[in-house]
């Protein structure tokens, strides 16, 4: 009979809460060779792309009236594009089911700072980072605008927000994922005399709207639901497996060496993103040649590149998520 070595349980090595995020580190070991990468990559992709949340997807300026993001507001230091970039960093939590778009309002006079705490949200909603600065106002500033939020998953570019609920609506990229970053690496582990088993270390950073444990549980549920469909679709009465799964505890495992899949991804050329020629040339002119070079830049850094506008930024973000499950730093 063939034996498969599997872990007895997932070990939570570290959990902590920071001002802007939650963090947790997990260890799953030992596993048969290759399973660390298989499981780690699957979890990472689902965590970054498929955990639902609520995000701001549009804005409408009522006082003063403005109709596009390339404009300015009297008495406000930041232009509308900068304000929108800050709005995308708001961490919005909903304790009630969200089936339709939700309207929120902001009314503020200067002087002073406009922060996320100034947003009036409906019952059942909460802003997890109320101290986030959105704009700087002087004595001339007198603002009244509406924000629209909806439920979703992953990243939805502004140009795909086709349903404009009000005249003057300016769409905003839907940054729905509550998971900010996921890393995993695979180390070689020894069980008795064999040294070719896998030990998978998984790190998760989430917004303050969800705990890493909850996000991980949801990701596992999503994967299991898909795999269960395959199992349920196969004919019954198949011959039993001539294998045995042998659980081994973490204490029986010795770590030998580290092999980081993340390093391999970071060394890939940006050509693998399959960007348009315009976006690709803009990045290369700014000496961005690899995925690692790209991830060192924030969204604001990229927008400073000549001829690299919001549409190019949306394209890069979408391709990073689709191809590698990665996301850019927000900056600030």
UniProtKB/Swiss-Prot annotation:
One example of a Gene Ontology biological process annotation: DNA-templated transcription
The keyword Calcium is assigned to this record: no
SUPFAM superfamilies for the chain: C-terminal domain of RNA polymerase alpha subunit, Insert subdomain of RNA polymerase alpha subunit, RBP11-like subunits of RNA polymerase
Gene Ontology molecular function: DNA binding; DNA-directed RNA polymerase activity; protein dimerization activity
Alphabetized Pfam families for the sequence: RNA_pol_A_bac (PF01000), RNA_pol_A_CTD (PF03118), RNA_pol_L (PF01193)
Catalytic activity, EC: 2.7.7.6
Start and end residues of each stretch annotated as Alpha C-terminal domain (alpha-CTD): 264-332
Catalytic reaction equation(s): RNA(n) + a ribonucleoside 5'-triphosphate = RNA(n+1) + diphosphate
Cystine pairs: none
Alpha N-terminal domain (alpha-NTD): annotated segments: 1-234
UniProt keyword list: DNA-directed RNA polymerase, Nucleotidyltransferase, Transcription, Transferase
Any one of the GO CC terms: DNA-directed RNA polymerase complex
Domain writeup: The N-terminal domain is essential for RNAP assembly and basal transcription, whereas the C-terminal domain is involved in interaction with transcriptional regulators and with upstream promoter elements.
Family designation: Belongs to the RNA polymerase alpha chain family.
HAMAP family assigned: RNApol_bact_RpoA (MF_00059)
Role summary: DNA-dependent RNA polymerase catalyzes the transcription of DNA into RNA using the four ribonucleoside triphosphates as substrates.
Subunit structure as annotated in this protein's UniProt entry: Homodimer. The RNAP catalytic core consists of 2 alpha, 1 beta, 1 beta' and 1 omega subunit. When a sigma factor is associated with the core the holoenzyme is formed, which can initiate transcription.
Protein name per Swiss-Prot or TrEMBL: DNA-directed RNA polymerase subunit alpha
Recorded name of the encoding gene: rpoA
């Amino acid at each position: 009979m063939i034996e498969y070595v599997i872990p007895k349980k997932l070990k939570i090595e570290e959990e902590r809460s920071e001002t802007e995020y939650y963090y947790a580190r997990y260890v799953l070991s030992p596993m048969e060779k290759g399973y660390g990468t298989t499981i780690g990559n699957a979890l990472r992709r689902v965590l970054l792309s498929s955990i639902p949340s609520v995000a701001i997807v549009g804005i409408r300026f009522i006082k003063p009236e403005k109709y596009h993001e390339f404009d300015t507001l009297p008495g406000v230091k930041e232009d509308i594009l900068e304000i929108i970039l800050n709005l995308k960093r708001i961490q919005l939590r909903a304790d009630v089911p969200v089936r339709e778009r939700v309207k929120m309002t902001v009314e503020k006079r200067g002087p002073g700072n406009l922060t996320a705490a100034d947003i009036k949200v409906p019952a059942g909603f909460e802003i997890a980072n109320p101290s986030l600065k959105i704009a700087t106002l002087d004595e001339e500033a007198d603002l009244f605008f509406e924000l629209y939020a909806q439920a979703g998953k992953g990243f939805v570019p502004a140009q795909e927000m086709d349903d404009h609920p009000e005249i003057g609506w300016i769409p905003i990229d839907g940054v729905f994922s509550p998971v900010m970053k996921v890393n995993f690496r695979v180390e070689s582990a020894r069980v008795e005399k064999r040294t070719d088993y896998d030990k998978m270390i998984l790190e998760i950073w989430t917004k303050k709207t969800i705990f890493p444990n909850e996000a991980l549980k949801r990701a596992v549920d999503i994967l299991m639901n898909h795999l269960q469909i395959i199992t349920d679709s196969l004919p019954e009465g198949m011959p039993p497996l001539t294998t045995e799964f042998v659980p081994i505890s973490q204490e029986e495992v010795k770590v030998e060496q580290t092999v980081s899949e993340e390093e391999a991804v970071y060394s890939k050329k940006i050509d693998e993103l399959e960007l348009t020629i315009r976006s690709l040339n803009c990045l290369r002119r700014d000496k961005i040649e690899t995925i690692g070079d790209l991830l060192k830049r924030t969204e604001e850094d990229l927008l400073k590149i000549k001829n690299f506008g919001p549409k190019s930024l949306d394209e890069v973000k979408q391709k990073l998520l689709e191809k590698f499950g990665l996301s850019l730093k927000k900056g600030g």
